[in-house]
């Protein structure tokens, strides 16, 4: 292995006290169609798009039955309206970039966080920090802020700050970087074709800056990165 992650003593002690089912409940995020018993044992719960009232009721019900505090998550990449019927839906991250106003992207994140937290969510799967390197990419398109890494970083970072400043955990996606392939990573393992230097100077730079600036979560995509294999 190229990198070794050091063990945290407190985490290790907690893990050693868990059986397999308890451990899986800490690292797997079930969705709301799972049985109520299974959901209430988990530490995370993904809720599919629904109305404001239905989502709020489900979150309150699961919370009341759970043995511990849970984190509720859904995909609000374009604002809370992406998942919550009746909440504000914003245009794409590309639109935020084309508007040329970093503060607008920040306010998008702020509004998304405010509406999501009112329902009971703690976490969202966004923003998308992919670079549009191939205009025929079926996954990226206008979800990407730009073809330019600096614009991608500028506007998605503003959106992330808006989310996290107002209490909603942000998620960067899709590591190690989509946008250079013509394949849908949900259907096949797509390949990021960049050389090590190209990746370091683009996606590597973007993710490094986000980590330094306090992003909480990074989502891995179904994407290979041959430049960083074991060779």
Question: What do the predicted segments below correspond to?
Answer:
Residues 1-42, 49:
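Preference for extracellular/luminal or secreted protein segments
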Residues 6, 31-34, 76, 108, ...:
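Short secondary-structure boundary/capping elements
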Residues 17, 61, 115, 162, ...:
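A generic secondary-structure signal
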Residues 19, 75, 116, 203, ...:
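Divalent metal-coordination and catalytic microenvironments
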Residues 20-26, 43, 67-70, 120-122, ...:
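Short, well-ordered coil/turn segments that N-cap beta-strands
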Residues 36-155, 174, 179-193, 221-231:
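Enzymes and membrane/adaptor proteins characterized by extended Gly/Ser/Thr/Asp/Glu-rich
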Residues 163-172, 198, 202-217:
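Phosphate/pyrophosphate-binding betaalpha-module
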């Amino acid at each position: 292995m190229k990198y070794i992650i050091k063990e945290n003593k407190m985490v290790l002690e907690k893990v050693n006290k868990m059986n397999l089912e308890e451990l899986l409940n800490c690292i797997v995020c079930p969705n709301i169609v799972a049985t109520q018993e299974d959901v209430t044992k988990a530490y995370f719960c993904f809720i599919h798009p629904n109305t404001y009232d239905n989502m709020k009721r489900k979150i309150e019900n699961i919370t009341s039955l759970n043995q511990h505090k849970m984190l509720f998550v859904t995909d609000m990449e374009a604002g809370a309206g992406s998942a919550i019927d009746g909440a504000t839906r914003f245009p794409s991250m590309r639109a935020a970039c084309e508007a040329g106003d970093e503060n607008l992207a920040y306010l998008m994140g702020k509004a998304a966080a405010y509406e999501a937290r009112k329902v009971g969510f703690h976490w969202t799967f966004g923003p998308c920090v992919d670079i549009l390197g191939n205009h025929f990419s079926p996954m990226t398109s206008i979800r990407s802020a730009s073809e330019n890494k600096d614009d991608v970083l500028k506007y998605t970072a503003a959106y992330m700050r808006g989310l996290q400043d107002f209490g909603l955990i942000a998620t960067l996606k899709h590591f190690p970087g989509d946008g250079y392939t013509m394949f849908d990573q949900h259907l096949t393992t797509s390949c990021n074709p960049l050389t090590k230097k190209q990746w370091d100077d683009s996606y590597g730079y973007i993710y490094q800056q986000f980590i330094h600036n306090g992003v909480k979560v990074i989502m891995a995509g179904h994407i290979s990165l041959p430049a960083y294999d074991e060779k």
